[in-house]
Amino acid sequence: MPNPLARAKHNASINPQLNPSINPKVNAAINPNFNPWINPTRNSRIDPKFNRSLNPLLTASLNPVRNCLLDPKQTRKFSGLCRLTPESELLGYVVRTRQKAVLLFFDKDLNWTAHAVDNSREGYNVFDREGDWKGYVLKNQAGGWNEFNLEGDWTGFIV
């Protein structure tokens, strides 16, 4: 039987281009450009530049450089979530922190590349290592998340 992830691009539960309810270009309620509650530039509670407790650059317990339990190079106890392209190619991995509001993103070589902060509306905002907002992650209907850039383009999914 073929790998179901290989068919993600053709699966309306995952692909937002096939499902308007999970497509931020069609559904303004899930698009941070139109919904100020999930936009970190308009809601400082979900902006790690203002809410230091959500910032792994400033909070040692969330920083994989300072907390080896969060670094997949140093521990085997990580969540095991994978970041994939829309074509189901491996982009990297996701580590859940003890603080459920923060996820850490790593590339295929297990280098820390970004972090994501819970937007309190079943999604996360993605920030690069410098703390700049680069995109967002929204729940899909297959039990995972879809990743988008700031323009709302689908860049991948997490399972």
Give the role of each language-model region.
Residues 2-159:
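Repetitive, compositionally biased segments used for assembly/scaffolding
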